[in-house]
């Protein structure tokens, strides 16, 4: 369960902020955690990251998930950095 949560947060950091400085990457990770803590959002990091598509309206909380492209990270260094950020915030 924790591994899945870390992967979801890391994917979100990767796709939303991989070209940003570390501060921006941490901010994206904290957005997910803040939403998990908010009653208006699901209480699960993966459900927060993937929220929206299930309603069939094509609008997700994070646009990379609804863009129709592969969700497999291609930039190794950026993916490793995103995983590190996820581990540090959790």
Residue positions per predicted region:
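Bacterial extracytoplasmic/cell-wall-associated proteins, especially those involved in peptidoglycan
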Residues: 2-90
């Amino acid at each position: 369960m924790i591994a899945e949560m870390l992967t979801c947060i890391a994917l979100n950091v990767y796709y939303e902020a991989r070209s940003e400085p570390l501060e921006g990457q941490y901010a994206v990770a904290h957005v997910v955690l803040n939403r998990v803590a908010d009653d208006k959002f699901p209480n699960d990091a993966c459900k927060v990251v993937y929220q929206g598509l299930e309603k069939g309206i094509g609008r997700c909380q994070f646009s990379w998930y609804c863009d129709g492209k592969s969700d497999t990270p291609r930039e190794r260094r950026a993916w490793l950095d995103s995983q590190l950020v996820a581990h540090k915030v959790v």
